[in-house]
Amino acid sequence: MSGTDENDFEATYAVEMHCESCTNDIQKCLKDVNGIKNVTFDIKDNLMNVEGHAAPSAIINALKNCGRDGIIRGTGKPNSAAVSILGQYTTGPFENTVKGLVRIVEVAQKKTFFDINLNGVEKPGLYYASVRASGDLSEGVKSTGDPIYKFDQPIDCTSPSDSIPNSFSGSSFVSAPVHVWELIGRSFVVTTDPEHNVNKDNDISFGGVIARSAGIWENDKEVCACSGKTLWQERKDAIQHNIRF
C-alpha cells in the first residue's frame, strides 16, 4: 500500500461475496480504477473497505462492468459525509424525476470532494454545478437562493444513458474549500446556464437538499426498519428511481 495523503479517505461497500475466489475477482474488477490504494474484505458480512481517493461512483461502475453490484455503506470519518439527490422541478415528460446524485466527503481541513453523477437528462451538453444558500425547494431550484460556491469544471453530459431512452448522462469528481457542516441543509443545483442562473425559462436546472450521510462503519443495517426490505431489495427500488450510486 502507498502512503496516505490529504486526498485519501475510506469508504465501505456492501458487495456480495462467498469466498476468497470472490475477493480475487473483485480485486481484478478494481485494478484499473485510479486512486485506489488499499482494499480489504469482510467475507462474513459482505463488506469491502477501500482506501484512497477514487470516486465512489467509479468503484460502483467497475463492479457493474464485471457483473457485480455494490452499495456504498459509508464514506469518510463521522460527520464528514453528505449526499444530495437531484430532482428536476419542471413541467413536461421529465417532471419531478431524479436526475442524479451527489456524494460528498470531507478529506482534510477545508477540502471536500464532490462525486457528481447525472443520468436521464434530456438535453446533451455541459452542465454547471453550485451549492446554493438555501435548501428551500418550494419553487424548485428558483427558491434556493444565491450560489455560495460555484464549481468551475462543467459536467459533460453527452454520453447516452444506458438506462433511460433518449437521454444522456455524465459525471464529475471535484473538490471545494468548504466543510461538510457548512453545507448541510443547503441545496446542490445543476444547470445548463454557465453563469449558474436558475431563473431562465429556457435553461434546464435540477437540484436537491444536502443531507448528512453515514461515515465509514456507521451504517451496518441489513434490513430497513421502515420498509422491512433487505439491503438489496432497497437497492433495486433505488435503481428504479434512477438512484444508482
Curated annotation (Swiss-Prot):
- Which is an annotated Pfam family here? HMA
Q: Which InterPro entries match?
A: HMA_dom, HMA_dom_sf, SOD-like_Cu/Zn_dom_sf, SOD_Cu/Zn_/chaperone
Q: Which Gene3D superfamilies match?
A: 3.30.70.100, Superoxide dismutase, copper/zinc binding domain
Q: Which cofactor does it need?
A: Cu(2+)
Residues that coordinate or bind Cu cation 1:
19, 22
Q: Which of UniProt's keywords are assigned here?
A: Chaperone, Copper, Cytoplasm, Disulfide bond, Metal-binding
Single GO biological process annotation from the record: superoxide metabolic process
* Single annotated GO MF: copper ion binding
- List the GO terms this entry assigns under cellular component, sorted alphabetically: cytoplasm
Q: Which residues form a coiled coil?
A: none
Superkingdom to which the source organism belongs: Eukaryota
Q: Where in the cell is it found?
A: Cytoplasm
**Domain annotation HMA: ranges:** 8-71
Q: Which PROSITE patterns match?
A: HMA_2
Q: Which cysteines form disulfides?
A: 29-66
State the free-text cofactor note.
Answer: Binds 2 copper ions per subunit.
Binding positions (Cu cation 2): 224, 226
Report the family membership.
Belongs to the CCS1 family.
Q: What does this protein do?
A: Copper chaperone for superoxide dismutase 1 (SOD1). Binds copper ions and delivers them specifically to SOD1.
Q: What is this protein called?
A: Superoxide dismutase 1 copper chaperone
Q: What is the lineage of its organism?
A: Eukaryota, Fungi, Dikarya, Ascomycota, Saccharomycotina
